[in-house]
Regions:
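Small/polar-rich, solvent-exposed N-terminal microdomains that initiate assembly or binding
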Residues: 1-64, 152-164
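Extracellular/virion structural assembly segments
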Residues: 1-21, 64-69, 76-105
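Acidic-leaning, charged glycine-interspersed low-complexity segments
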Residues: 20, 24, 44-49, 93-145
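Short, internal active-site loops enriched in acidic
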Residues: 35-37, 77-79, 121-127
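Short, solvent-exposed beta-strand/turn "edge" segments of beta-rich domains on protein surfaces
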Residues: 60-67, 127-131
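Intrinsically disordered, low-complexity acidic/polar segments
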Residues: 61, 81-83, 147-151
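Oligomerization/assembly interface segments of phage tail-like spikes and tubes
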Residues: 66-82, 132-146
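Hydrophobic secondary-structure block in the mid-to-C-terminal portion of proteins
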Residues: 134-164
Length: 164
């Protein structure tokens, strides 16, 4: 299932946002750093996909296009009450794992990135922000399939001269 219009977006963030939005109105999407998320989560009342502003990455230059490979952190967080015994929060962690699975499935279906497969480590988030949230954070290897076209011509003038 390729998301309509997603190929026209030039940034990794726009592609991630489009995937998150395709998951329905029951999921909030945030793109910001952890400090901004700390403030924003105060007003959030539903499970959220938080794409943390990447601190670094790699640009892969080839003849006709550039592909972006950001170092990503994507949080799957839900507001929670502070729970000392952890029973309720364990249930929320499992729900956020399911949200992460749904997100990765949608990401793979978008065909904007190389397939995410294999073992993907996660970190459990509990009492990490000022607002009580519970969830997980994945560091997903987002590798663009198409990237950005930087050369509209199919061949170079030098290549045509050599063939003569």
């Amino acid at each position: 299932m390729e998301l309509k219009g997603i190929k026209k977006y030039g940034t990794v963030e726009a592609k991630v946002r489009k995937v998150a939005e395709s998951m329905g109105e029951d999921v909030e999407y945030l793109f910001m750093n952890w400090s901004q998320a700390n403030v924003a989560m105060d007003a959030i009342t539903k499970p959220s996909v938080v794409y943390v502003l990447p601190p670094s990455g790699k640009l892969d230059f080839s003849y006709a296009r550039v592909k972006d490979y950001p170092e990503t952190q994507i949080g799957f967080l839900a507001p929670t009450d502070f729970d000392f015994d952890g029973t309720e929060n364990d249930n929320i962690i499992e729900q956020m794992k399911r949200l992460a699975i749904k997100f990765v499935k949608a990401l793979n279906a978008s065909k904007c990135f190389e397939l995410i497969e294999g073992k993907q480590p996660y970190q459990v988030v509990y009492d990490f922000l000022d607002q009580n949230v519970t969830g997980i954070v994945l560091n997903l290897p987002l590798e663009e399939v198409d990237g950005i076209i930087i050369c509209d011509e199919e061949s170079r003038y030098e290549d045509e001269k050599e063939g003569s």
